[in-house]
Regions:
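Negatively charged
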Residues: 1-221
Length: 221
């Protein structure tokens, strides 16, 4: 039996998944006894997990993908503020439908991330604490990033959107979002904008979005 007072170091994702399953089978939800420093792939790791787990002290410094890592983890709200995300490139669907999640992510280095598709979709409790100064200068796909984040309201004026190609439905259904700072965005490569602010009644549409609507002969509802 694993002694949770000792660190256990899996060499790959398969071994890590076995350790997690073992812990859950023994009603162990504090997973900080696992040394994850050798893991590079954490995709789909906790999909539809029903437990309130603690992974706050995990070493993710070598991880390159967190694709669908916490999809459907409705109770998940572990403190991830000190995670080193410097090598992650893919955060696609990372917190999809984590309805309880509302962690301060101000310390995250996301400067190498290119894919943020649907990253926080349906995170109904997520307010966006700490995202103000994220370096998203390499992000290309931001579709549905905050889709139906009903409590999201963050000032994103400092975001470098120069590489963003797809941002359609990015803030769809963000009822409390006021759109602070969006006028400052320079969208040099963006191809897809549609339905970006649908359901965002508090947003004053930035000029670049109005220009898009005009080009497409559309109206904002």
């Amino acid at each position: 039996m694993v002694n949770v007072l000792d660190k256990v170091q899996p060499k790959n994702k398969t071994q890590l998944k076995r350790l997690i399953d073992y812990a859950f089978n023994h009603n162990i939800y504090d997973l900080n006894f696992i040394d994850t420093s050798k893991i590079t792939n954490m995709s789909n790791l906790f999909m539809n997990c029903e437990y309130d787990i603690d992974v706050s002290n995990w070493d993710v410094s070598n991880v390159t993908t967190t694709f669908c890592m916490f999809v459907g983890c409705k109770k998940f709200n572990s403190d991830l503020s000190n995670w080193n995300m410097a090598n992650v490139k893919n955060m696609n669907n990372m917190f999809y439908c984590c309805k309880n999640f509302d962690c301060d992510l101000s310390n995250w280095n996301v400067s190498n991330v290119t894919d943020m598709y649907s990253m926080f979709t349906a995170c109904e409790n997520f307010k966006g604490k700490g995202l103000e100064n994220w370096d998203v200068s390499k992000a290309e796909d931001m579709r549905y990033m905050f889709y139906n984040c009903k409590n999201f309201n963050c000032d994103l004026s400092n975001w470098d959107m120069s590489k963003a190609l797809r941002i359609n439905e990015m803030f769809y259904g963000c009822k409390k979002f006021e759109g602070k700072g969006l006028e400052n965005w320079k969208l040099e490569k963006t191809l897809f904008y549609y339905d970006m602010f649908t359901g965002c009644d508090k947003v004053k549409l930035p000029s670049w979005y109005k220009a898009f609507l005009k080009r497409c002969n559309l109206e904002f509802f």
